[in-house]
Amino acid sequence: MNMNDMTKKLYPVTGMHCAACAGNVEKIVRKQEGVENASVNLATATLTVTYNPDIVSPQQLKEAVMKIGFDLIIDEDNSVQEQEEAEQSYYGQLKRKTIVAWIFALPVAVLGMFLMNVPGVNWWMLLLSLPVILYSGRSFYMNAWKQTLQRTSNMDTLVALSTSIAFLFSLFNTFYPEFWYSRGLEPHVYYEAATVIIAFVLVGKLMEEKAKGKTSTAIRKLMGLQPRTARVVKDGREEDILIADLQVGDKVSVRPGEQIPVDGVIVGGNTFIDESMISGEPIPVEKKQGDKVLAGTINQNGAFIMTAQKVGKNTVLAQIIRMVQEAQGSKAPVQRIVDKVTAVFVPVVLAVAVFTFLVWIVAGGADDFSYAMLSAVSVLVIACPCALGLATPTALMVGIGKGAESHILIKDAVALEQMRKVDTVVLDKTGTVTEGRPVVTGWLHDAGWQNEHKGILYAAELKSEHPLALAIVEALKKEGEKPAIIDSFESRTGRGIVVTRGNKTFWAGSHRLLKDFGAGISDLLKGMVEDYEKSGKSLVYFGEGNTLLAVIAISDKIKDTSRQAVKQLKESGKYIVLLTGDGHLTAQNVAGEIDANRFISDALPADKENVIKELQAEGRVVAMVGDGINDSQALARANVSIAMGKGTDIAMDVAMVTLMTSDLLLLPKAFKLSYKTVRLIHQNLFWAFIYNLIGIPVAAGILFPLYGILLNPMIASAAMACSSVSVVLNSLSLNWRKL
């Protein structure tokens, strides 16, 4: 398939209850012609599918999923709302079924355990069992049948089979007790096992759904930032419309205290806006005509008119939500092993149950038929693919959600796994270690300098987008300088800029450009230049031909949090490397200020990638932290790429991890989050595997020959319910842990 024709979509799936369900949905979607890849996440109840829309449509995918008893929500505009409504409806049904199950299961259990010798008790138990089997347990049997028709199986298969065996065996013994009496045996009934199993499984599902709902609180908070309506200005009148109906170019009125509905630019008025939910910065930002504003942020005290530039799924907030959803729906590398286990889990359990039954019959004969049946039923009931299926995705969901709440955006599960292995962190200086707001702090003029040169320098730097160029432009603007007319402009990557005016060539840039033109620093300036470098200043050299005219000293303040962040990273065993295009003395000064282990100076953008390669060649696992703009090659080369953004400058598509604020203290938090989330995944998987490895043999009766202990199917169902709930609760515990 041509990947250019492919579309990647995320659709909510309803009706899934266990890992086998998720695996079956994944399998059926992958079988469809035109589907390149499909991945189902049980915890988020979502399908991520890559397909060719010319070959297969979302409706066809929906129909394929419905054939095996599930449903796909393909209405993208209302998918979130539909999913919430479906979840609420399912939870309500589950609650009703659970209440009905216990209302009838409890008297059945009492009759079965304490009043077995009362005449006609079997008939009373049968009547009381029917609402549990036919109403509360109906979905188990319906889903199991649909799975069977598709030659697949899941947890519903195990529950349906175990309760059917217990109920049908009891039904036979109620109607035909003579069959056993004629053979000298007692006709036992197990209505209480069938009903209580269903009741316990439903309780487990109810608790699981409640707990799973809490794992998605982060995404719900983000979605809560999206306003439902906007006030559009048309022909001088204001009209409230739904966000979905808002178009690019519409004029929108925003009043004090309101959430901004879409991304756009202010065309009238000024205000202060609280951007903390996006940028993490607590202080409101002043906005005036021409400034950009973001959807979901809150207007403080001024009214303004804005033009909508990005609406719907194209806003920064929508991108953040989509990124978090996709990350929560991604699979950790270890999940591939779990998927292979869960794919064969139910068939293996069925085989173990049959084997258990046969061993009991062979060992004990017909006298042990009841023991054989109870043990087989217990094996079917206690086996829990849910715990295995939920172990990884619930931990990821909580971890990635907690990251989003802390303004740490993690692209996928692989990024979390990789971050845990990082031992070396490379920090780009400008905008990462420093504030990224350089200001001119000094001018050194050489002998050839004339006042008219300022206009030429101004004109040259106006055409450059480099942060240092912007600082020079700002300084000259404050002096009231006017840009001169220049004839040509050339940008030299990692070096600077070259312009011509008449028959003269002027240049401005780093010491490399100084050398390229064969210019030298006079003895008069040399000492002062060294002093500037030693104090951590960045230097821009300006000259004509082979003559140096001026040296501009530019200061970019080190962030208050940089030293503390580096300290925390070093305490966790990380090796810190400072990377900069500045000269040796400047780099040495900044590295000393933050206490980096090592610094690399004079690095061109292309050199930065080689630095990462060299560190990796030393056997290091490297994380590169930059602004995601001028160090994209190095970010791509690193084992983990981390971009720092702020407000409208968030470069979410660039890196595996995006820190949404300029606070470098988020970096050690991100590493802690990775470590804790991956550790949680391993804990969940360990206990899920251990539960099944111990529970299934005990249910089969392995303890009976030694201690006379035989597990009751009712206890087995309670244990199964607790196992999946405990996995979800363990994942939720991450919410209460400090980063």
Model-derived features with residue positions:
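Flexible metal-binding regulatory segments at protein termini and peripheral loops
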Residues: M1-G120, W124, K146, K221, ...
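Conserved cytosolic catalytic loops of P-type ATPases
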Residues: E33-I55, Q59, Y191, R220-N314, ...
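Actuator/coupling domain of P-type ATPases
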Residues: Q60-E82, N122-M125, S129-T229, V233, ...
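Conserved catalytic phosphorylation-site environment of P-type ATPases
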Residues: I278, L374, C384-A460, L615, ...
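Conserved ATP-binding TGD loop and adjacent catalytic N/P-domain core of P-type ATPases
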Residues: G23, R501-N503, G543-Q683
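Signature of the cytosolic headpiece of P-type E1-E2 ATPases
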Residues: A105, L468, K477-N589, L604
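Membrane-embedded alpha-helical bundles of multi-pass transporters
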Residues: F114-N117, L149, L168, K402, ...
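Bilayer-spanning, highly hydrophobic alpha-helical transmembrane segments
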Residues: I99-A109, R336-G364, A376-T394, H682-L711
